[in-house]
Amino acid sequence: MNLIELDQALRKLRLSGMATVLEARLRQAQTERMAPIDLVSTLVADELLRRQDRLLERRHKQAGFRDPDRSLDTFDFEFNRKMNRALIHELATARFIAQREDALLLGPPGTGKSHLAQAIGRAAILQGYRVTYREAHTLIEAIADATLDGTRKDLLADLATVPLLIIDDLGMRKLPATAGEDLLELIMRRYERASTVLTSNRPVDDWGKLLGDTAAVTALLDRLLHHAHVLKCGPRSWRTKVHTDLRSEEATK
């Protein structure tokens, strides 16, 4: 079997990681006089690395992040120094997911809640967890649509089992009258079974008015807060800072 035939055989066996580097590794083996076992070990390591990279890429895509490049490395901790940096880094370890705990990120618009939630989600993927990201209004609308077309049971089953569900921007848009009950059912299915990160620009005392069902919200908060890490974001807003900087630039022209 020549090199071309070997490459084709490896790809048929779905060993594309080996096939991609085969020629280079064979040259390396000759140059370094590698033992056969060392060459095989190196090729296997190449295959495992490629599969891991493809798995991470697939999970990042499946997560559905709104801003897929968000990370803790790109978050400006100096802008809001009062934020609990230790808690943020603790959440990024994903230990709270292993312990089936939740996290609430609360604060005014523009204070970094969505950035941090997605950064925590990316960190969780790197540590082997599946993650689903949904903006609150699209999640609630999806559940309502699934109720109408008969797929509600399947949708809730999928959402209930993902190890980390991120519900972003609760309170940014008006929600349907069924939002409270739908969100409660989802959280009850996940309670002590999987982790949820929820961000909101509204204090929890306002959630009854927001979701239109005080009783459902009371039960919802009871479960969310039972094993929850609460991060207060702010008080300074990045959006306000940008507008202020722009006004300052205009004033100096």
Residue ranges and their predicted role:
Residues 70-94:
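N-terminal pre-Walker A segment at the start of P-loop NTPase domains
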Residues 4, 8-11, 20-24, 41-42, ...:
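Solvent-exposed alpha-helical segments within well-ordered globular domains of core cellular machineries
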Residues 12-15, 29-37, 62-65, 77-81, ...:
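Conserved phosphate/pyrophosphate-binding and hydrolysis machinery centered on Walker-type P-loop NTPases
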